[in-house]
Amino acid sequence: MYSCTSPSGIEVSLNKPEIWEKFYPKTEMIVTRKRGRVIFPHLDYNVKGLDPDSLYSIYIHLERVDGIKYKFDAGEWKEAGKGDPILPIQYKEHPRGKRTGTEWMSEPVSFAHLKITNDPENKDQKLILAQSLHKYIPVLHIKQLDPYKGTFQMDFHGVEFRLEATQFIVVTAYQNEELTKLKVHHNKFASGFRSNGKRRLSSESENSENSPPKRSASAISSLTPPAISPPMDYTQQNPYFFNQNFFSTPQSHQPQFAAHSANAQNYNNFGAQNGAQFDWNVYYQRQWYWQQQMMMSGGIGQPQMLNNGFPNL
């Protein structure tokens, strides 16, 4: 229930099983459309039995447990009818990318950044799609690097681990009062409820758990424009070196500037007021070129310590 061992000897267990034990089997997870909601208790795993020197990549996805849609009635969850059509699987790679077995086993493998949403149009890489009033179980995948090809086999889905205690029902509002109290007690960032059990105002609960509060428009407008542009998102350039999901369509290798066009224009306008103009596209192209040179010089098969879009992880 709290741990699982594969035939090859790889063992996966929950880092804090005592917390999951208090929630199971009535665990509920809030889902929101815009910003998503962090999964709590967090999906933190301990991994043992890996080859210390081999490279591995770890993924996670949410799997529907059954074809049933549920309802909360008389203090318990009951079958409400046939479930909605099952959605395609979304594999989410751990932001640390490829690491040796020693590195993965040295500390918990945490997916605390992962949020669930019910908006199929939301493309945020930290969000994973789930359907309300359906039961899910997180599935952990561990993929080993092919030592002969120097890359992952595209048809190899790795070893899968399902821990029964992590099952949960997706809801838009907590149904179980006792579970609500547990959430507030164990999670100081619990959104939607104050510590006294009362609901927060909509303006208070809009931010998801662990998310920083929004800044006011007046505060943002008063900021002085930065001297340089924010760093480019290089994760869109090369699907091999940048921890891309191997189950998704490879991204273009050409630099993309659309995400920064508005900022570049603003900064150019700011520079014009001071009698200067700067070609931001040329700046990005040069930065992208030298970044590519640095990556290629590192050699294939070496862990790439690059920006993966998830700070502090």
UniProtKB/Swiss-Prot annotation:
InterPro entries: p53-like_TF_DNA-bd_sf, T-box_DNA-bd, T-box_sf, TF_T-box, TF_T-box_CS. GO terms for cellular component: chromatin; nucleus. One of its GO terms (biological process) is regulation of transcription by RNA polymerase II. The keyword Nucleus applies. Its main location: nucleus. Keywords: DNA-binding, Nucleus, Transcription, Transcription regulation. GO terms for molecular function: DNA-binding transcription factor activity, RNA polymerase II-specific; RNA polymerase II cis-regulatory region sequence-specific DNA binding. Residues 19-195 bind DNA. SUPFAM superfamilies: p53-like transcription factors. Residues 193-228 are annotated as: Disordered. It is found in: Nucleus. Transcription factor. Required for mesodermal induction, acting redundantly with transcription factor tbx-38. Together with tbx-38, acts by inducing cell fates in the AB lineage, thereby playing a role in development of the anterior pharynx. PANTHER family: T-BOX PROTEIN 31-RELATED, T-BOX PROTEIN-RELATED. This is T-box protein 37. It comes from Caenorhabditis elegans.
